């Protein structure tokens, strides 16, 4: 692949090369080789940044690919690599979008999930409530992102022995879940 990574590469070649490294990253992840997955993803984004003058770094596909990897790393309980990728994701969102965008809300949601996995209830609450606010302002409350946020807040408060809040977020989760199901009919 590296023979295509040169000073004469055009936008299409650079984009394809970046996508190849992203796919390699996903392959490593499926093989449960988290360090190699993170390294390949970093290479994919380094290529995008190297050719940023063509707008490759600003591609929303890049953000979606990063978030998919973060989610997979979290499912694999590879929190350290998830934090590395999330840091890059957050930097791109803040540089090219804003701290009120849906993408930043998703960033706060992911950070809240990481905080929960690390047993840090106070930062988890702060990040999940931030996600609830940002996502709600960006796209409303009737969507899967908000449903996920409510589910994690319910779980957090149940673990943290705050039953009133846990019940409130359970009810919000069930309300959004039913609304989303109704939209599918």
Regions found by a protein language model. Name each.
Residues 141, 147, 154-185:
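Hydrophobic positions within repeat-based interaction scaffolds
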Residues 113, 117-120, 126-129:
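Helix-coil-helix junctions within alpha-helical repeat/solenoid scaffolds
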């Amino acid at each position: 692949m590296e023979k295509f990574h040169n000073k004469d590469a055009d936008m299409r070649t650079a984009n394809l090369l970046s996508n190849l490294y992203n796919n390699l990253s996903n392959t490593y992840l499926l093989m449960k080789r988290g360090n190699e997955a993170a390294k390949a993803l970093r290479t994919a984004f380094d290529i995008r940044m190297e050719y940023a003058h063509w707008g490759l770094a600003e591609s929303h596909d890049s953000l979606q690919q990063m978030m998919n990897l973060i989610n997979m790393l979290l499912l694999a309980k590879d929190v350290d690599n998830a934090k590395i990728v999330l840091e890059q994701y957050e930097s791109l969102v803040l540089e090219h979008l804003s701290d009120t965008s849906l993408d930043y809300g998703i960033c706060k949601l992911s950070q809240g999930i990481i905080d929960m996995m690390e047993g840090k209830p106070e930062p988890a609450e702060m990040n999940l409530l931030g996600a609830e606010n940002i996502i709600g302002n960006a796209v409303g409350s009737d969507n899967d992102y908000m449903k996920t946020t409510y589910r994690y807040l319910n779980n957090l408060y149940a673990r943290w022995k705050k039953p009133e809040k846990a019940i409130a977020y359970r009810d919000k989760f069930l309300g959004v879940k039913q609304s989303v199901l109704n939209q599918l009919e």
